[in-house]
UniProtKB/Swiss-Prot annotation:
Its main location: cytoplasm. It is found in: Cytoplasm. Methylated by PrmC. Methylation increases the termination efficiency of RF2. The gene is prfB. The modification N5-methylglutamine is found at residue 248. Belongs to the prokaryotic/mitochondrial release factor family. It comes from Corynebacterium glutamicum (strain ATCC 13032 / DSM 20300 / JCM 1318 / BCRC 11384 / CCUG 27702 / LMG 3730 / NBRC 12168 / NCIMB 10025 / NRRL B-2784 / 534). This is Peptide chain release factor 2.
Amino acid sequence: MRPEFSAELSELDSTLTTIEKVLNPQEMSDRVRELEAQAADPSLWDDPDHAQQVTSELSHVQAELRKITDLRQRIEDLPIMVELAEEEDGDTSIAEEELADLRSLIDALEVKTMLSGEYDAREAVINIRSGAGGVDAADWAEMLMRMYTRWAEKNGHKVDIYDISYAEEAGIKSATFVVHGDYMYGQLSVEQGAHRLVRISPFDNQGRRQTSFAEVEVLPVVEKVDSIDIPDADVRVDVYRSSGPGGQSVNTTDSAVRLTHIPTGIVVTCQNEKSQIQNKASAMRVLQAKLLERKRQEERAEMDALGAGGNASWGNQMRSYVLHPYQMVKDLRTNFEVNDPQKVLDGDIDGLLEAGIRWRMAESQSAE
């Protein structure tokens, strides 16, 4: 085996060993047996919500345990694969592809070990609002929504759009959607902040360069254990007809719902479900998420906590997307750069997410 091949394999083996110490496969295996016993109890479904939590956790832990076991087996098999290839014809290209695949999978698993926050395993609510920049900012907000939904689709995660407020000329004023799947909040929460776009404006007949901003807010989906109870008297409910681009009505009934939380002034709208009841339920989920985040901010006394909301303008951006006069996406916190903005805008943001998660971990450790 070539020395450089052996060295990289040894490094991956060491990284996986560190991951195993953090995730503890034996404890995971014990937890699987415990959950399987609960799932086999016929009385479990007397409480459907608890039953759903048990089956969901069981499925998740089983999948993670299989992933670790499979990676360990593949690392142990790789030297044999290389040895056989060298003995037959010396072509180790298949083994090299396997090594590259293992490197990618282990890097991704290593990042997941950094998602240990209280809410990191949750699904994510994403709010996008256009900021400074007029019609270009509205168009930019819609481009960001497309970027995140494309990323979710590529990774097999369902997206439910709760609300879109369209701008008059082009783009959107705001959008709210949920990305389903384990650890979506932990991964996507690093996207929170002001995103800056520099390009030749397609809306300027003189073809001038335009800078525009959009704000991204990421919240964890609220679960029953969070105890976010909202008295009916604290919420004003308004209903209206759903509208589409240009303000056109897309529904003949008042199915869209606007919730106003009277004590805080927080407003949430939802118009994409088929009925008023469904829209109200979806809007309530988002309102609960916002109130949970407000509660966390108060407890931690941090004005820049998750979901605090910022000013999408100069001096507040966390990432720049430059399409002119050169091509580059640069995260201003991590200094991670991508020289193909279109690829990023098409949903290829894994590198940016990983860099953000590693940066957040380093910041957390340095603050201790």
